[in-house]
């Protein structure tokens, strides 16, 4: 699967704080326990490039820059070029922005990475937010339910030449069958059995997510909200691979 080319640990920890000091502390503590870090829109809006660079220096881990770009193609291409100096390993857009927008994002990432002499990011698209269920989606005017929409948008993403999608692990098995082993599946909404579900409705455990075909697991509060984040990350690793992590 594509994940093996990035890191042996499939867990990217979602550092969902706007405080740079807290984020850098978490990144440093988790350096040996996770495969990467995810920074999102709220952190980026508050702290910009400087804050992202500080966290990346502290953690020395691959970066998933979760900004979910969604605008006209030229604007998205410009936004992608603007964040490329941060050298993200993963960068995402909204699939519902359409094929032309996704192509523009991919081409901008590739050309700017070449100009900067860095590896281009894996470009992925958001299908349906994991906070949404069938009723929520129907309220936006989309018929057919979450899975139908996820499959449509994932196919569109592949046709635009992107590397994969963000999806719930509950859709991963179907998407793996639809789109093959070389299509990256990044799954938020993953919670170990000992954690609460918080605000995400389509939730599975880490072990279940991997069994369903996920490549990257995005896990936030079960790790970052724990008394000992490093221990929590090790417990999750133990759930995934079924080994005794010595805790």
From Swiss-Prot:
Record-level Gene Ontology MF annotations: orotidine-5'-phosphate decarboxylase activity
Active site per UniProt: 68
GO cellular component: cytosol
Gene3D superfamilies, sorted: Aldolase class I (3.20.20.70)
Recorded metabolic or biological pathway in which this protein acts: Pyrimidine metabolism; UMP biosynthesis via de novo pathway; UMP from orotate: step 2/2
PANTHER family with a match to the protein in the record: OROTIDINE 5'-PHOSPHATE DECARBOXYLASE
Described purpose of this protein according to its UniProt entry: Catalyzes the decarboxylation of orotidine 5'-monophosphate (OMP) to uridine 5'-monophosphate (UMP).
Annotated protein name in UniProt: Orotidine 5'-phosphate decarboxylase
Organism field: Rhodospirillum rubrum (strain ATCC 11170 / ATH 1.1.1 / DSM 467 / LMG 4362 / NCIMB 8255 / S1)
Lineage, uppermost ranks: Bacteria, Pseudomonadati, Pseudomonadota, Alphaproteobacteria, Rhodospirillales
Gene name for this UniProt entry: pyrF
């Amino acid at each position: 699967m594509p994940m093996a080319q990035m890191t042996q640990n499939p867990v990217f920890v979602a550092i969902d704080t706007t405080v740079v000091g807290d984020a850098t502390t978490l990144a440093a503590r988790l350096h040996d326990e996770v495969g990467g870090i995810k920074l999102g829109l709220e952190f980026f809006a508050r702290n910009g490039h400087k804050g992202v660079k500080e966290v990346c220096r502290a953690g020395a881990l691959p970066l998933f820059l979760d900004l979910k770009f969604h605008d006209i193609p030229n604007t998205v291409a410009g936004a992608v070029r603007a964040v490329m100096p941060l050298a993200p390993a993963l960068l995402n857009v909204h699939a519902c922005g359409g094929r032309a927008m996704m192509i523009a994002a991919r081409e901008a990432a590739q050309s700017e990475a070449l100009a900067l002499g860095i590896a281009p990011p894996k470009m992925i698209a958001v299908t349906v937010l994991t906070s949404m269920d069938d009723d929520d989606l129907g309220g936006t005017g989309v018929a057919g339910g979450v899975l139908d929409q996820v499959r449509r948008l994932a196919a569109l993403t592949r046709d635009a030449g992107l590397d994969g999608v963000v999806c719930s692990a509950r859709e991963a098995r179907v998407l793996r069958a639809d789109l093959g082993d070389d299509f990256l599946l990044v799954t938020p909404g993953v919670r170990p059995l000992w954690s609460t579900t918080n605000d995400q409705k389509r939730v599975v455990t880490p072990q279940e997510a991997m069994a369903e075909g996920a490549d990257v697991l995005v896990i936030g509060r079960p790790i970052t909200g724990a008394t000992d984040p490093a221990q929590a990350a090790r417990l999750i690793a133990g759930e995934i691979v079924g080994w005794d992590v010595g805790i």
